[in-house]
């Protein structure tokens, strides 16, 4: 991406139409990174499905997941993108900053921890046993709970319904449903979007990189829209901070 940014002089044009063109190029480039193919104008969900899946229903399900990941107001990565865009960095710079934030284990990188939990469940006697083992060790259950959705993440709920309708009796999906039920019963926490992306990956037998790939590509579309909006405002995003630590000792003669 840095190499493409250096060669794309149009990216320095921050007018709305130009940012839209650059954003489309960025989405194709990011998709190419996950498909290991040249950038293409084919629909993104079709590219990912052709590379990743053999399941006929995969394309529509991947498309739904991309849409569900596209925007979620001012999460950490999107706020980062808007801050960078406010400096008048190019869309490449804004998106690369967003990707850096997204990969953190408390953001999109959480999907790797959810995948590890799924592996534990697959190796355990039952989902309940895996949940109990985590709880006895005093460990969190990744993929559960969201500060905005104490009653359940609607993105996860929708993707689960779509998977159930499309796949019916799928063993990986059944395991995910049992895991969610066991975790919610014992913690009161509902599964979130990170859980649903791993549930999708396991149910469709997609590669391990798929959850993060879908999250990053889907969210990139939202980042471009946020950057477009930010470029239209002249203000630099500059929050203030107030020092609340110990006061330095005054020097004595």
Where are each of the predicted segments found?
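Hydrophobic alpha-helical bundle cores within soluble ligand-binding/oligomerization subdomains
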Residues: 1-253
């Amino acid at each position: 991406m840095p190499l493409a940014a250096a060669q794309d002089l149009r990216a320095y044009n921050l007018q709305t139409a130009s940012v839209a063109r650059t954003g489309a190029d960025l989405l194709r480039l990011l998709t190419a990174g996950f498909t290991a193919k040249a950038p293409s104008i084919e629909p993104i969900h079709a590219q990912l499905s052709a590379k990743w899946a053999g399941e006929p229903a995969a394309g529509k399900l991947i498309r739904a997941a991309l849409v569900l990941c596209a925007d979620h107001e001012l999460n950490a990565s999107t706020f980062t993108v808007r801050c960078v865009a406010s400096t008048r960095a190019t869309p490449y710079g804004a998106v690369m900053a967003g990707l850096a934030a997204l990969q953190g284990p408390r953001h999109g990188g959480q999907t790797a921890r959810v995948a590890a939990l799924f592996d534990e469940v697959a190796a355990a006697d039952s989902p309940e046993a895996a949940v109990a083992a985590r709880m006895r060790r005093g460990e969190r259950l990744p993929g559960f709970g969201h500060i905005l959705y104490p009653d359940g993440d609607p993105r996860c709920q929708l993707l689960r319904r779509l998977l159930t309708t499309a796949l019916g009796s799928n063993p990986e999906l059944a395991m995910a449903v049992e895991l969610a039920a066991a975790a919610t019963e014992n913690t009161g926490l509902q599964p979130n979007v990170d859980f649903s992306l791993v549930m999708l990956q396991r149910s469709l037998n997609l590669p391990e990189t798929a959850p993060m790939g879908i999250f990053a590509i889907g969210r990139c579309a939202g980042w471009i829209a946020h950057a477009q909006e930010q470029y239209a405002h002249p203000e630099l995003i500059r929050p203030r901070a107030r020092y609340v630590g110990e006061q330095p000792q005054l020097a004595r003669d």
